Every structure is written in C-alpha cells, then in structure tokens.
Design a protein with these regions (language model features):
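Helix-terminus loop motifs that line ligand-binding clefts
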Residues: 88-117, 124-195, 199
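Acidic/polar, glycine-enriched structural segments that form the non-catalytic walls/loops
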Residues: 1-113, 131-136, 142-152
Length: 200
C-alpha cells in the first residue's frame, strides 16, 4: 500500500468527511442494504432449535457433550458468512488472522496471512456459501504473490516459477520468515493458495 502512490491520509480523511455528512439513520440503512445484499442469498434450515432459549455457551457445552443441535450448526454457518461479508470485499484486502476486529497496535502474528492453513480456511466456504465475489481480495493477493514470489524463487532456489512461504502480508512478501525452521522455511503456500483459483 505504501508503494502504490496513494495518499492514505487524504483517502481516510475523504472517507471520514463523506461519512460525517450522513446522519446515523442513513448510514444504518445503507449498511443494512449492503450487508443483506450478500447475506440474504442463502437460507439454511436443518431443524428447529429446541435450545433457542438457552444461552449460547450452554448450547455449546451441550453440543460438545453430544447433544444434537442442528440449529447451532446453522448459526455457525451463518456466523462464518457474517465474518467473511464483514472482512473481505472486492477492492480491499483479504480476511487476515485477526480481521477488522483487531484491537492491538502490534497484533499477534502481525495480523498477516498464514499460508499453511489460516488464510485458506477463511475462504473455504466462500464459493459454496454464495459469496463468490468476496473471494476476489484473496485472488488479487495471489496474483501479486505470483509476481513477488517469482523473484523469491529465483533468489532463494534458482528455479523457475513462484513460491510463497509460511506468511505473507499486504505487501505480498514471499520470502522465508524468521522463526522455527519447521515452519519458517516452508515454501508451499503458493501451491496451496492456487486451489482457490481453481475453485473460483
């Protein structure tokens, strides 16, 4: 982002100025319309809940003890869709480790994209959950990784093609990370990420 020539201060100021011109009711109405455009595409019903009057933590406890609660499974499915709708939009960055809910100045794992499973898991349901266009931030990142990863592959392995190691970030870094050699030097993130291109 700091290499693309945009003035982030001006962009943020323009967004804030535009938002301040709207009243709360208009902002809420726009938000609901925008959100429902994605959310209302899917309705999943497995069974009526017999536990809907029980607090969620108790339902989860009962579920882990073997109680059947298909409505809880539906709730989790829709919660996963909510998270992706809220954190991955065309033209933006992909959903990352902490997402938009991070409250740290320096978040755990830098809120990066861990390519040995975490980044992929965020998007496992995107196509089957009828949210295909929310896949595009990850697909755009993969295209950028193919460019930076080509240089990494040449520099580290003297080989053709491209790679991304265990972690990447909004700058599409692909080189090995510091940390335990058991994961820091893992060069197969690109291969795994390419499954998302195929699914899309």
């Amino acid at each position: 982002p700091d290499k693309d020539g945009k003035d982030e201060s001006k962009l943020a100021g323009d967004y804030l100025t535009a938002a301040l011109r709207k009243n709360f009711d208009d902002l809420k109405k726009n938000h609901i319309s925008d959100y429902q455009h994605y959310f209302n595409r899917v309705n999943l019903s497995l069974a009526a809940s017999t536990y809907s009057d029980i607090p969620l933590d108790e339902r989860l406890k009962r579920y882990t003890e073997g109680a059947k609660d298909p409505a809880l499974e539906v709730l989790y499915f829709q919660f996963g869709r909510y998270l992706l709708i809220s954190s991955s939009r065309p033209g933006g960055i992909p959903a990352n480790l902490q997402g938009i809910w991070n409250h740290h100045v320096r978040p755990p794992w830098s809120s990066n994209f861990t390519t040995n499973i975490n980044a992929e898991m965020n998007y496992w349901m995107v196509e089957t959950a009828n949210l295909s266009e929310l896949h595009t931030p990850l697909l755009d990142l993969i295209q950028r990784l193919a460019i930076t990863g080509k240089e990494t592959t040449q520099n580290f392995y003297h080989a053709p093609g491209w790679t991304v190691h265990h972690n990447t970030d909004i700058w599409a870094t692909t080189n090995p990370m510091s940390g335990s050699p058991s994961w820091a030097n893992w060069p197969l993130g690109g291969a795994w990420l390419c499954q998302h291109l195929w699914e899309h």
